[in-house]
């Protein structure tokens, strides 16, 4: 049995990133799900092409793994322009930003992942670049310091964030197109898994794809990660074909239950129940008890637990729901913090 398999791991290895890139759709036609977002982007992109100008700046926000990077690449492909990728933490100082911006060709797309992590000083420099296609930078230091203005080619900034609430109001206001990505339903994920299996030349039954989809937390990145692991089991424990039996066997071995919850999800719920009588309890306290980063819990784990009804946020903190007790086979604490059984 494989232990501590984190299907939401943010730091991908080179091999895993190559795997993801091989499965990415390159145009709107091949992109599944997010219908409203895609339909709107089709119109915005077509209008920009008709006017032969840069597309307005785009902000994509939502939980990890829903296709923000893929959509950004598709935007560039559909516009027929260059595509450059960077991230908020990488742009450490204004000179880093200036180097990227001055390398852009007219109407290119610049993708900044984790844009909420831009340093305040870099963000200030970005304002004029987004509005006026120019940037002012300081040359030298002390008495000889002077400011020079660099003219930039028109470009489209696509910013991606999993925590849109951390964006400053001035930065958010400079995005003309603001789009939120939702979790995917099982039918769409099933089609994504079958497409990925075809690309990987792995036979995969429809029911098996549906089984993987139902445990993928509404997230294509997780669906593809699970497909890769189930493929391993199919090749070693089976005939190489992914059927529903081998899919279920593999997912159980990976501790992915029928709700898509893994060992860490269940540990969060159990900690709140066992140590804090079901809550409410503060996020920082939960993080300390688990030895996890509070931001990671809030950004990576909580959204799905809340969406599926296992956890809720209250003014006094996090609290597990009746569904969580039922899922874990636990008794429920009443409001006086005494136990009772149904």
Swiss-Prot record:
> Pfam families recorded for this chain?
AAA_lid_4, RuvB_C, RuvB_N
Chain sites annotated for binding DNA: 313, 318
* EC number(s) per entry: 3.6.4.-
Q: Provide the alphabetized UniProt keywords.
A: ATP-binding, Cytoplasm, DNA damage, DNA recombination, DNA repair, DNA-binding, Hydrolase, Nucleotide-binding
> Would the keyword ATP-binding turn up in this protein's UniProt record?
yes
Q: Name one GO biological process term.
A: DNA recombination
Q: Where in the cell is it found?
A: Cytoplasm
Give a yes or no for keyword Membrane in this entry.
Answer: no
**Reaction catalysed by this chain?**
ATP + H2O = ADP + phosphate + H(+)
Q: Where is this region: Large ATPase domain (RuvB-L)?
A: 1-184
Q: Which family does it belong to?
A: Belongs to the RuvB family.
Question: Subunit composition?
Answer: Homohexamer. Forms an RuvA(8)-RuvB(12)-Holliday junction (HJ) complex. HJ DNA is sandwiched between 2 RuvA tetramers; dsDNA enters through RuvA and exits via RuvB. An RuvB hexamer assembles on each DNA strand where it exits the tetramer. Each RuvB hexamer is contacted by two RuvA subunits (via domain III) on 2 adjacent RuvB subunits; this complex drives branch migration. In the full resolvosome a probable DNA-RuvA(4)-RuvB(12)-RuvC(2) complex forms which resolves the HJ.
In terms of NCBIfam families, this protein maps to: PRK00080.1 (NF000868), ruvB (TIGR00635)
Family matches, as PANTHER family: HOLLIDAY JUNCTION BRANCH MIGRATION COMPLEX SUBUNIT RUVB, PTHR42848
The protein's name is Holliday junction branch migration complex subunit RuvB
Q: Name the source organism.
A: Phocaeicola vulgatus (strain ATCC 8482 / DSM 1447 / JCM 5826 / CCUG 4940 / NBRC 14291 / NCTC 11154) (Bacteroides vulgatus)
């Amino acid at each position: 049995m494989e232990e501590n398999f984190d299907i939401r791991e943010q730091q991908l290895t080179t091999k895993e990133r190559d795997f993801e890139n091989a499965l990415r759709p390159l145009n709107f036609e091949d992109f599944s799900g997010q219908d409203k977002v895609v339909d709107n982007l089709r119109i915005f992109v077509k209008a920009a092409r008709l006017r032969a100008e840069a597309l307005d700046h785009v902000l994509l926000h939502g939980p990890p793994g829903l296709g923000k990077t893929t959509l950004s690449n598709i935007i560039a492909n559909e516009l027929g322009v260059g595509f450059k990728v960077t991230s908020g933490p990488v742009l450490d100082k204004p000179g880093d930003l200036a180097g990227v911006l001055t390398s852009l060709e007219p109407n290119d797309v610049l993708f900044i992942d984790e844009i909420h992590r831009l340093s305040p000083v870099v963000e200030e420099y970005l304002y004029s670049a987004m509005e006026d296609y120019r940037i002012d930078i300081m040359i030298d230091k002390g008495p000889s310091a002077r400011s020079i203005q660099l003219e930039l080619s028109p470009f489209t900034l696509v910013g991606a964030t999993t925590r849109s609430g951390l964006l400053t109001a001035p930065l958010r206001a400079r995005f003309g197109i603001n789009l939120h990505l939702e979790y995917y339903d099982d039918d769409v994920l099933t089609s994504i898994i079958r497409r990925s299996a075809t690309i990987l030349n792995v036979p995969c039954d429809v029911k098996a794809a549906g089984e993987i989809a139902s445990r993928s937390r509404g997230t294509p990145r997780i669906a593809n990660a699970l497909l890769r692991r189930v493929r391993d089991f199919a090749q070693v424990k089976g005939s190489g074909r992914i059927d529903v039996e081998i899919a279920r066997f593999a997912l159980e071995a990976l501790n992915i239950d029928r709700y898509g919850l893994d060992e860490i999800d269940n540990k969060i719920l159990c900690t709140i129940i066992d140590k804090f009588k079901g809550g409410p309890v503060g996020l920082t306290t939960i993080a300390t008890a688990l030895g996890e980063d509070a931001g990671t819990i809030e950004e990576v784990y909580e959204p799905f637990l809340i969406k599926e009804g296992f956890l809720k946020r209250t003014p006094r903190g996090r609290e597990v729901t009746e569904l969580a007790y039922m899922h874990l086979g636990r008794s429920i604490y009443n409001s006086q913090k005494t136990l009772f059984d149904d």
